[in-house]
Each structure stands twice: as structure tokens, then as C-alpha cells.
Amino acid sequence: MEMSDYDIVNLASIVEREGLNADQRAHVASVFYNRLAGKLDGLRYLNSDATMMYVTGGEVTADDLQSDSPYNTYKHEGLPPTPICSPSLEALEATLEPSDSDDLYFYITQDEEYFSQTYEEHQQSWN
């Protein structure tokens, strides 16, 4: 996928906030590239909690997901208008060299990580 330097920094800022370590960030970057390529039902939504947390400053509620904010990547396809943080070198490297996966979903906590290709698998991973 062809991206400008600015877009790479923008995506890396989201990868920075979603992953907790280098391996997770490379896998998260892969998921986001798959989503940007339209592999999620032909849509290009990032569906990132991190972009919404940038807007809310904390937890994200169901009401927040209805926001028309350009940072609401559940409602607006593609990248948000600006980076949400200054990404680390690790996040930039992960974005430039993502893992090779077909995954479209992930769930990461301090203790667990789940990556999946279908929404059904995703739901099972955190239920």
C-alpha cells in the first residue's frame, strides 16, 4: 500500500497507542493495513479505540462512538486528520515493516493479546 511519509507517521501514532511491545505493534500495523486495504467487508474503517481516546481523553463509551469527530475511526474511513501522538521509533518501524497476517481484529490488555480474522473469532477471544 502506497502511503506518504505523513500518513506513515499518522498510522504509527495509532500503532503506538494500540500495541504494548514491538511484536504487538507489528501485528497491529498489519491489522490496520488490512483494514485500510478494504479487507473488512470492503470498508476502510480503522475502528481504533486509541483515536477515540485521543478525543475523549480517557475511556470510550458507546455514545462516544456516535461522535462526528474526524478522529472517530469507527465512523470515518481511512486515517484521522493528524497523528494522535508522537510515535516511537519502534512504532514507526512496526508500521514500515508490519507482520504478515490476514487478521482484521485484535484485543490487547496488559496480560493478554488476541488477533483474529473474523468478528466471530474476535468476540470469542474476549468473552
Task: Identify the role of each PLM range.
Residues M1-N127:
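Bacterial extracytoplasmic/cell-wall-associated proteins, especially those involved in peptidoglycan
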